[in-house]
């Protein structure tokens, strides 16, 4: 399986994402600069965290116009796994690949620490290796992680089981309905504020994020490997 880590000007979690795939999964991975217009050679697309284009205007607001976004939308339409983490989630929202928007944390501060999450849906290509309702610990690092959508959209997310992760116990940023991560209706585009790539080895303080990447590989192998 071949992963692409998309790098925008201002990305700063791309190396973490790369090593999570290369070192912990043992899968092929390449950095892809934001000006490419084709991602056909890749099986999964990863949008890492950071401050794309300095987060001017809004987080992700300029990155949505990058050349690579056309290729990302095409990959999403083809059903390939697309994962946006932190700033990557914000970019997916700005690009319309996921519903809703991000606001500043209700504390008006940057928050960087481990946080508890509950797995609300383990039937996606990103969460099959988790137990339903499993509580995991994943780091967060953001100043604009306060997810918001209108009431109609929230009810659709609930009805369609698109809410994948919710903050457990403490809501660190004021996010609506404790939402930490959602998928699109098709289930192949996941956006989440916590950083699973920073939780893939016990030496990093925990490995709860590794199952997310293992889930992607499991999905791909089940879909593409022919058993004889």
Swiss-Prot record:
Localization terms from the record: Cytoplasm
EC number: 6.3.5.3, 3.5.1.2
Alphabetical UniProt keywords: ATP-binding, Cytoplasm, Glutamine amidotransferase, Hydrolase, Ligase, Nucleotide-binding, Purine biosynthesis
Annotated GO biological process: 'de novo' IMP biosynthetic process
Gene3D superfamilies given in the database record: 3.40.50.880
One Pfam family it belongs to: GATase_5
Highest rank taxon of the organism: Bacteria
Catalysed reactions, as listed in the record: N(2)-formyl-N(1)-(5-phospho-beta-D-ribosyl)glycinamide + L-glutamine + ATP + H2O = 2-formamido-N(1)-(5-O-phospho-beta-D-ribosyl)acetamidine + L-glutamate + ADP + phosphate + H(+); L-glutamine + H2O = L-glutamate + NH4(+)
InterPro entries according to UniProt: Class_I_gatase-like, PRibForGlyAmidine_synth_PurQ
CDD domains: GATase1_FGAR_AT
HAMAP family: PurQ
Assembly and interaction partners: Part of the FGAM synthase complex composed of 1 PurL, 1 PurQ and 2 PurS subunits.
NCBIfam families (UniProt xref): FGAM_synth_I (TIGR01737), PRK03619.1 (NF002957)
Protein name: Phosphoribosylformylglycinamidine synthase subunit PurQ
């Amino acid at each position: 399986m071949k992963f692409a880590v998309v790098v925008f000007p201002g990305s700063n979690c791309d190396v973490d994402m790369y090593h999570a795939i290369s070192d912990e999964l043992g899968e092929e991975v390449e950095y892809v600069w934001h000006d490419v217009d084709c991602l056909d050679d890749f099986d999964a697309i990863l949008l890492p965290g950071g401050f794309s284009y300095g987060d001017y205007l809004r987080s992700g607001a300029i990155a949505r116009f990058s050349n690579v976004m056309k290729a990302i939308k095409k990959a999403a339409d083809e059903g390939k796994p697309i994962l946006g983490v932190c700033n990557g989630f914000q970019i997916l929202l700005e690009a319309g690949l996921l519903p809703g928007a991000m606001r500043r944390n209700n504390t008006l501060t940057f928050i960087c620490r481990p946080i508890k999450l509950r797995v609300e849906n383990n039937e996606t290509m990103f969460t099959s290796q988790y137990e339903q309702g499993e509580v995991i610990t994943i780091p967060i690092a953001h100043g604009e992680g306060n997810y918001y959508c209108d009431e109609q959209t929230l009810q659709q997310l609930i009805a369609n089981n698109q809410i994948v992760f919710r903050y457990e116990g403490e809501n660190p940023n004021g996010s609506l309905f404790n939402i930490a991560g959602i998928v699109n209706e098709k289930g192949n585009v996941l956006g989440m504020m916590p950083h699973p790539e920073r939780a893939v080895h016990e030496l990093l303080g925990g490995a709860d994020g590794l199952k997310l990447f293992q889930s992607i590989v499991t999905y791909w192998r089940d879909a593409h490997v022919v058993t004889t």
